[in-house]
């Protein structure tokens, strides 16, 4: 088939690589426009755009993909199907109608669970034991279209969102390729999503990533892992905003929620249940470091609290 691949961030790369090596022809890549990134705020292409250019594939970067001008441009490519992995924009019916076999999205959850922009983070924060990836035919409503296929993935007790997403990106790439094969062969029929079990995973704001120390230790552990690496779980300690990496549970210590206790080798923070031990932290404007090293340098006293 003639395919346009729509995607933007690094987790979309395994899928693009699989399709470039497949029996299908990737005639163009649709990705978000260049954005400013890094400390110098220099303009940078998306990871998907960079990979496409390495392979000599045309790159399309419309700021408004639903505008009539781009709808006409896509129609001129005479594509059979569009494959989508984390493109980053909602698509309107006029654009969805262009390819004769529609738009197929790879979503990193077992739909209808965790529709939306942050399914991996939501599954870890909720304490799910199993998640996966789903290919489905895109409809105007958010992540609601009929399903072509799924793969499952177990969530380990130490998984961060970054680690889990990395595995799903790889297994999902194989699912997307097999879905494209099945559609071309006429061997796949999309099945409507279940009515029950719908949950929503909206984009996470920086404020939502803040740690609420009154919660139980296990919930805080899941929250921190769900926010790692982006946007990063954070708190204020001694007047400094600090990102917090995955933690350990200090079952022999009881501290009031948010109370900080600096030990020789550990920094403990009280929760709604047992205390937790911080491992790595990143104070605002500084590099990642061991929590104990930071605490010594910051000279935290016995009265400090995490807020």
UniProtKB/Swiss-Prot annotation:
Binding of (6S)-5,6,7,8-tetrahydrofolate: at which residues?
A: 109-112
Q: Which transformation does this protein catalyse, written as a reaction?
A: L-methionyl-tRNA(fMet) + (6R)-10-formyltetrahydrofolate = N-formyl-L-methionyl-tRNA(fMet) + (6S)-5,6,7,8-tetrahydrofolate + H(+)
Xref: CDD domains: FMT_core_Met-tRNA-FMT_N, Met_tRNA_FMT_C
Keywords per UniProt: Protein biosynthesis, Transferase
Stated EC number for the protein is 2.1.2.9
The top EC class is transferase
Q: Which Pfam families match?
A: Formyl_trans_C (PF02911), Formyl_trans_N (PF00551)
Question: Disulfide connectivity?
Answer: none
List, alphabetically, the PANTHER family matched: METHIONYL-TRNA FORMYLTRANSFERASE, METHIONYL-TRNA FORMYLTRANSFERASE, MITOCHONDRIAL
Function description: Attaches a formyl group to the free amino group of methionyl-tRNA(fMet). The formyl group appears to play a dual role in the initiator identity of N-formylmethionyl-tRNA by promoting its recognition by IF2 and preventing the misappropriation of this tRNA by the elongation apparatus.
Family the UniProt entry places it in = Belongs to the Fmt family.
Q: What is this protein called?
A: Methionyl-tRNA formyltransferase
Q: Which organism is it from?
A: Mycobacteroides abscessus (strain ATCC 19977 / DSM 44196 / CCUG 20993 / CIP 104536 / JCM 13569 / NCTC 13031 / TMC 1543 / L948)
The protein's gene is named fmt
């Amino acid at each position: 088939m003639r395919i346009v691949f729509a995607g933007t961030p690094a987790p979309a790369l395994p899928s693009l690589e699989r399709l470039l090596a497949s029996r299908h022809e990737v005639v163009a890549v649709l990705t978000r426009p260049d954005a400013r990134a890094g400390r110098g705020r220099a303009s940078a292409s998306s990871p998907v755009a960079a990979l496409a250019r390495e392979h000599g594939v045309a790159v399309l970067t419309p700021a408004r993909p639903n505008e009539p001008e781009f709808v006409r441009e896509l129609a001129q490519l005479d594509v059979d199907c569009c494959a989508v992995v984390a493109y980053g924009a909602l698509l309107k019916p006029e654009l969805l109608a262009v390819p004769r076999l529609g738009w197929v999205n790879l979503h990193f959850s077992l739909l209808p669970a965790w529709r939306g922009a942050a399914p991996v983070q939501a599954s870890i924060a909720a304490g799910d034991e199993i998640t996966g990836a789903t290919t489905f035919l895109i409809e105007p409503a958010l992540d609601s279209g009929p399903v072509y296929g799924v793969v499952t993935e177990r969530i380990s007790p130490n998984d961060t969102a970054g680690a889990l997403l990395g595995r799903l990106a790889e297994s999902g790439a194989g699912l997307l390729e097999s879905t494209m094969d099945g559609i071309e062969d006429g061997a796949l029929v999309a099945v409507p999503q279940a009515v029950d079990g719908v949950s929503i995973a909206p984009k996470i704001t920086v404020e939502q990533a803040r740690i609420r120390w009154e919660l139980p230790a296990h919930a805080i552990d899941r929250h921190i892992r769900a926010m790692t690496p982006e946007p990063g779980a954070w708190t204020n300690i001694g007047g400094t905003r600090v990102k917090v990496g995955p933690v350990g549970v200090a079952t022999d210590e009881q501290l009031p929620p948010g109370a900080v206790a600096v030990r020789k080798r550990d920094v403990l923070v009280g929760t709604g249940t047992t205390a937790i031990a911080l491992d790595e932290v990143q104070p605002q404007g500084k590099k990642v470091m061991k929590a104990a090293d930071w605490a010594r340098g910051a000279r935290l006293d016995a009265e400090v609290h995490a807020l």
